[in-house]
Regions:
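Catalytic cores of the polymerase beta-like nucleotidyltransferase superfamily
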Residues: 2-260
């Protein structure tokens, strides 16, 4: 576990400020009262470390879905059970996911097994997205070296890269998106897995389109992002009807890619 006091020296992480919304703080108080843990996880923690102001907050807990519902009900909070079978309950407009292992492939697992934080982190895609902020103790829990990877702008999967990508092939495009957004590099195993199997088979056209648009918008250098995507074999899958020489595209003309 990495305590915030270790992040305070004047370096690129000294600006860490995770400004948690008041409604989430209230939810946290209810969980703490019931002796259950509540963590902020993923993108919000990553962005705060980078000095950005997070817009979305994903929450994770050791409480089972029925326990989450009971805590919320006793606290007078509105709940939605739309993802209960997958370990996700919406409380006060915020998704709260129980620590779990996903059984099956794809965006929606066939079933889940509940676990602890060590088990939960193994199902996540990239190390930089597998950071937890413990609201009880004011500490970042980093079990996979995500902070060091952020420091190096290194994009690396959690565990075996081929297995993570096989679970959901869209993760391949996500890895490339974060590489482009950070202006960083792919980890060796992660890059090798992408080169060996860039296939996006089984992923809907809509998900591919949305991820591609997001990648284009967030890339620090659009041309370099497109060059790498082409080199790894993604553009011919994303835009199969277009015969375009990627290296000669002006990065300001990427809108042409979105009209498909």
């Amino acid at each position: 576990m990495i305590y915030l006091s270790n992040l305070i020296p004047l370096n690129e992480y000294s600006k860490f400020r995770l400004n948690i919304p008041s409604d989430i703080k209230n939810i946290h108080k209810l969980f703490k009262k019931n002796k259950k843990k509540l963590f902020v996880v993923g993108g919000a923690v990553r962005d705060a470390i980078l000095g950005k102001n997070p817009k979305d907050f994903d929450l994770a807990t050791d409480a089972k879905p029925d326990e989450v519902l009971k805590i919320a009900k006793n606290g007078g909070l509105k709940t939605v059970e739309v993802g209960k079978q997958f370990g996700v309950v919406i409380v006060g407009g915020h998704e709260i996911a129980t620590f779990r292992k996903d059984i099956g492939k794809g965006r929606r697992p066939s079933s889940v097994d509940y676990t602890d934080i060590e088990g939960d982190v193994k199902r996540r895609d990239l190390t930089i997205n597998a950071l937890f902020y413990d609201m009880d103790r004011g500490e970042i829990v980093d079990l996979v070296g995500g902070i060091e990877d952020l420091k190096k702008k290194k994009i690396r999967t959690v565990g075996n890269a081929a297995e993570r990508f096989d679970e959901d092939p869209l993760r391949k495009m996500r890895a490339l998106r974060f590489q482009g957004a950070l202006g960083g590099k792919l980890g060796r195993e992660t890059e090798n897995a992408l080169r060996q199997n860039p296939s996006l088979d089984g992923v809907s056209k809509e998900r591919i389109r949305d991820e591609f648009v997001k990648s284009i918008k967030k890339a620090k250098n659009t041309k370099k992002y497109l060059q790498l995507a082409d080199e790894l074999g993604f553009t011919k899958q994303i835009l199969p009807r277009y015969q375009i020489s990627i290296p000669y595209i002006n990065e300001n003309d990427y809108i042409l890619f979105l009209a498909w």
